[in-house]
Amino acid sequence: MSGRGFLLLALLLLVTVEATKVEKNKPGVLDIPVKSNSDDDSIFRYGRRDMQSPLLSERLRF
């Protein structure tokens, strides 16, 4: 692997770990609660769905 590719991978991992820390500390800015039109007060969350992806959690395990 070239030096540039290694640096990009390290930077991506660092950003991912920092984003995960922020996600645990407080809800994300993109998590907007929206009430549905039905009578029950179900809330849909938009944004940051990639944080719960199985591929990302597998990458963070090593």
Curated annotation (Swiss-Prot):
The keyword GTP-binding does not apply. Residues 20-26, 47-62 form a propeptide. Keywords: Amidation, Cleavage on pair of basic residues, Neurotoxin, Secreted, Signal, Toxin. One of its GO terms (cellular component) is extracellular region. It is found in: Secreted. Expressed by the venom duct. Residues 1-19 form the signal peptide. The modification Tyrosine amide is found at residue 46. One of its GO terms (molecular function) is toxin activity. Belongs to the FARP (FMRFamide related peptide) family. Negative results: the mature peptide does not contain cysteine residue. This peptide does not show activity on human and mouse sensory neuron-specific G-protein coupled receptors MRGPRX1. This is Conorfamide-Tx1. The lineage of its organism: Eukaryota, Metazoa, Spiralia, Lophotrochozoa, Mollusca.
